[in-house]
Amino acid sequence: MITSALLFLALLPNHQIAPQTIDRKALVDRHNVVLTEFDGARPLQVGNGEFAFGMDITGLQTFAPFNTMAQWGWHSSPLPVGKRIEDFNGQVWDTHGRPVRYPMPDPANPEVSFWMSANPHKINLGRVGLLMTKADGSAVLPSDLKRTTQTLDLWAGVVTSRFELEGNPVTVKTACHPTTDALAVQVISPLIKLGRISAFLSCPGDNPRYFANHVGELNSPATLETLRAEGNRVDLVRKLDATSYHIGLQWSGKASFGPVPESLNLPIQIVKAEYGAAKQWADVTYIVSKAITNNRLAIRVNSDNLVPDPAVGLGKLLRVTYSIGSQAQVVEANEGEFMVIEPSAFGKRLQLVPARDADSLAFTCTFTPKRLPSNLPTVESAFDSSRKGWASYWQTGGAIDLSGSKDPRWRELERRIVLSQYLMKVNASGSFPPQESGLVNNGWYGKFHMEMIWWHKAHYALWNRWPEVEPSLEIYRKLIKNSVALAQSQGYKGARWPKAIGPDLHEWPHEIHALLIWQQPHPIFLAELDYRAHPTRATWQKWAPIVEATADFMASYAHLNPTIKKYDLGPPMVVVSENTNAKITRNPTYELGYWRFGLRTAQNWRRLGGLPPKSEWDRVLKNLAPLPTQDGQYKTYEGIPDMWTKFTYEHPALIGAYGMLPGDGVDRPTMARTFDKVAKTWDFERTWGWDFPMLAMCAARLGKPEQAIDFLLHTSSGFQFDARGLATGGPFPYFPSNGGLLYAVAMMAKGWDGSSNGNAPGFPKNGQWRVRWEDLSPAP
């Protein structure tokens, strides 16, 4: 019998090989990140979901002012003098013959409207780097470091950075404590005995920018107040208007802590300046050097002030390496912004100097919004906890191993899968939904977007990593009071969920935010994923009020069209692609499909709880407008003009109705024709990162697995993964790309409701792919 069973398995095609035990450590280790060059724009990170630290090639923030960010790290600037939040009134738009007030910029109160947009904003908690000098006492530049190698041990969450300075080896180990917002650092080098290496701590000033790779104002560093200085520990507090937080520094061995000597009178030296984008850069060192006046650089970044456009059609930036005395750093500014460099950028730095007889410098730096605890993590305990925490993460939840595949693309796809799991744990597993760039930098002032919660969080359900998703789903319970009030103020029932918010839970005034609707069914989808994993009364009770309020709004939002006796969605409304006229947009394909899924699922939730179905939900569900078609294909919305000539850019969301969603209201042959048309005509250089997993999921459901793989490895510049796993697809980095990839591959490996029983139904069945997986759940 055993022999017969083995023979049967041996005769199965490769794609049907049953799941086997995966060597998870080997799977993860083969994708450890190895870097060999300095990059002032893209950090490597350590973090725990609540807190993250971005580093340059030195293992710290020595040259590049990367960010230290936390879920709790927000600040609100004071309101303009004489202004009040209560003065804000938004705008009134006609909505099916009713005047409805929306949270849009208030023409009568532009200052308050802008303040509400920019506040609260995420802040950079601090910068930790190395201070190094050459033998002659001059500043060390990135180019002075030789034999640079930086390795991220994914299984341990530890980064080891090695380099040589004038022939002297330096090794820096960096990690983050898994449950405390603490950075652990160990530096080993003979330069310590020579007094040529130490560590610094500084905090940039506040500068709420719409987008910022380097967050904060470097030229206005904060003053840190010392609360405690005893033995090998210093407790500091930073105060910023009404915001304050604490920093605790604890070190091993002998060291002294104090201010770095000021360099305010030393000249600024421009070492290198380049202007451009992608691979098109112009050397502007001479021009930038000549722009220094009275030892201060202030220059607007544009082609008029620098050189003729070196990268036509691309958003450019100015990147400058400069030194002041024995200190150096690399800064950048986007096109249209001012770059300002002043000697004060190195002011107010605090320095940890190891004793001259020491062999190493080891310390932890802990950040907290409250007073520091009596015991801070030691270096040893932080590294040990990191190793144990990451090993536990990798050994729980799902895994996908593609190493037996013949298609040479398997390694790159598997690399993206593994690195995305690391990055999403670091950036998107905390107590709040992440912003789209996670804890790397700031986009849209750092606010999180509620329509993106699906792309950031849904994959955790398919990978059975519920500890990484459950804390942030509390956002719906926190929001329900405000959301019910918003719906009522607009004449609707239930809860209207916002689009872009911060921890104050107030909508950022904006036309798109006020009219977007595709985030509305998300909590029903997420509740369904939770119940599928945890089919208990407790799960039902947890989600029932949210599902009920969500569906109540969805049913009351739909408007009965008296002419055709069908329920319309919009206008006014903003669709997923955000590129149509909100005042005429009606009945978009994706939103109609999601409305059907949401109302159908909500009715089923009532049945699960022993409640009768709601008649008003049924009435809307049964009479909702059909998904719009023309020439046998779906359209973005009903009546859209020139669909395939003017609107083949931004999100091809109509595909999502049968991919991301299970296809309520979808005719499969019509969707197949639509998919083929999109694949042939869409401008994939003008899309976003999560569009490609969405297309892959649609391809998988349509029985086009080869195209599903092609979309997950598409050549578009909007869906690329760098050596760290950081993805393009929006303002860089763009984590919906990573989250979408993880959802899509899990669905393709495990399957979805109604998919074939074979292994990996979404992967090609051509003998080129051998897919092994563990502990995945199917998609709806």
Residue spans for each PLM region:
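Acidic/His metal-coordination segments adjacent to aromatic residues that form catalytic metal sites
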Residues: F432-K447, W497-L515, G570-P588, G718-G730
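Acidic/polar, glycine-enriched structural segments that form the non-catalytic walls/loops
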Residues: N14-N265, A345-G446, W466, L479-V484, ...
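Catalytic cores of secreted or luminal carbohydrate-active enzymes
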Residues: P110-D144, N604, G739-P778
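Extracellular, modular beta-sheet/disulfide-rich ectodomains of secreted and cell-surface proteins
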Residues: S263-F346
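Sec-dependent signal peptide recognition
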Residues: M1-F8
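Active-site core of glycosidic bond-cleaving carbohydrate-active enzymes
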Residues: Q61, G82, H449-N482, G502-H506, ...
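Acidic/histidine-rich catalytic neighborhood
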Residues: A549, F553-W605
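Primarily short, surface-exposed interaction patches in extracytoplasmic proteins
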Residues: D401-E414, F432-G446, I480-S483, L529-R537, ...
